[in-house]
Amino acid sequence: MRIVALSDQHGFLPDIPPCDLLIVAGDVCPDRFGPFMAVHDPYQQQAWFDRTVRPWLAATSARHKLLTWGNHDWCGQMCSFRSDTPAHAQSTDLQILVDEGTTVASARGAGRELSVWATPWSNPFMRWAFMKRPSDLERVYAAIPAAIDILVSHQPPLYYGDRTFDLDAGRVDHVGSRELLDAIERVRPRIVICGHVHGGFGRYEHQGIPIYNVSVVDEAYRLVNAPTVIELPDV
């Protein structure tokens, strides 16, 4: 199965190469829609999503399209904007997942279905959407079922794709989630897809499990990375 994954678009809608499964791992929405619009206006975001993102998704060749939210996606948290409507699902084949799973058919219809679980949360930082304390995240991640194929999380696990530079302290910090790392060790998915930390883009590995940070923008919110293409063998 060919997977194309991206996160942290912040309003950018890059070209999507041909694939079987498209995964959007949060922060799809921009924060502001003009000089007189309030930052983090969830209803403006929802209108923008319906007007802009849905046609972009409908234009891709992906047979399956999955999305979870990120900390900039206020529409996902404030508007109860969770499951897709039948009319929109018919035109985009989109599933929006919030701490829930789904299955997708293998690329050629042979072999078993692939299981996917997606979660939008991040560690607390300033006042953003979809944030929980580590003690709460431990309970959230405990619901992830064992032996899934693909785990999608907006935030990265601790030590993998999570490095940031603290200008004030003059040091590199790891800001990923220890609780997510513990869940990965318990669940042992075939692959992990995440984002959130723009400078963490790339492929990593923990205990033989590939971890992809698929952010497409850099720390200055410039579009610098292409969507990540992952070939996952059918089983």
Can you describe what each PLM-predicted range is?
Residues 111-150, 169-178:
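Binuclear metal-dependent hydrolase catalytic cores centered on His/Asp/Glu-rich metal-binding motifs
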Residues 126-131, 155, 160-167, 204-205, ...:
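A short secondary-structure junction signal
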Residues 6-107:
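Core catalytic region of metal-dependent phosphoesterases/phosphodiesterases
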Residues 57, 141-144, 184:
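Short hydrophobic patches on amphipathic alpha-helices
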Residues 5-7, 22-27, 64-71, 97-99, ...:
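Active-site neighborhood of phospho(di)ester-bond hydrolases with catalytic His/Asp-centered motifs
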